[in-house]
């Protein structure tokens, strides 16, 4: 019985190591959603002086893709906390000098619209995903 219990515990512990990508915790995703709501609501002036970022397909690696797109915006203090949250949710760390070829870059949109799209998609993920 003790051997069976030990085997179950080992399988549970190693199960997370074999998953294809880390699953964000519900708390981290909820904090990101709250931050995006705070940023996007009641915008009377252009966010980040109307800076433009690459529009992305947020269906795969959405946190890394969003971080990769926002990392080039350096003079906007409003999104610094969002970038830190995305950095924590992203398993690999992109840099401003390293442009990822993983994402198709064909259209630029304003940061405000990008964050609204990210908020909408994050809410969908939060509603539909099961968290540990």
Curated annotation (Swiss-Prot):
Q: Give each disulfide bond as a residue pair.
A: 48-76, 64-90
Question: What is any one GO biological process for this UniProt entry?
Answer: immune response
**Which Gene3D superfamilies does this entry report, sorted A to Z?**
1.20.1250.10
Residues with glycosylation annotation: 38, 49, 57, 75
Q: Which UniProt keywords apply?
A: Cytokine, Disulfide bond, Glycoprotein, Secreted, Signal
**UniProt GO MF annotations:** cytokine activity; interleukin-13 receptor binding
Gene Ontology CC: cytoplasm; external side of plasma membrane; extracellular space
Position of the signal peptide: 1-18
Q: Name one Pfam family in it.
A: IL13
Localized where?
Secreted
User: So what does this one do?
Assistant: Cytokine that plays important roles in allergic inflammation and immune response to parasite infection. Synergizes with IL2 in regulating interferon-gamma synthesis. Stimulates B-cell proliferation, and activation of eosinophils, basophils, and mast cells. Plays an important role in controlling IL33 activity by modulating the production of transmembrane and soluble forms of interleukin-1 receptor-like 1/IL1RL1.
Complex and partners: Interacts with IL13RA2.
Protein family according to the UniProt entry:
Belongs to the IL-4/IL-13 family.
- Name the chain's protein: Interleukin-13
Origin organism is Bos taurus (Bovine)
UniProt lists the gene as IL13
């Amino acid at each position: 019985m003790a051997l069976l219990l030990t085997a179950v515990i080992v399988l549970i512990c190693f199960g997370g190591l074999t998953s294809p990508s880390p699953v964000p915790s519900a708390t981290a995703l909820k904090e990101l959603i709250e931050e995006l709501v705070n940023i996007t609501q009641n915008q009377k002036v252009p966010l980040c002086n109307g800076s433009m970022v690459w529009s992305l397909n947020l269906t795969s690696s959405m946190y890394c893709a969003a971080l990769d797109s926002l990392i080039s915006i350096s003079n906007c203090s409003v999104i610094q906390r969002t970038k830190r949250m995305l950095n924590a949710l992203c398993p690999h760390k992109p840099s401003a000098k390293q442009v990822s070829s993983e994402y198709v870059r064909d259209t630029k949109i304003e940061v405000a619209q990008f964050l609204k799209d990210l908020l909408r998609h994050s809410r969908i993920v939060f509603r539909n995903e099961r968290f540990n």
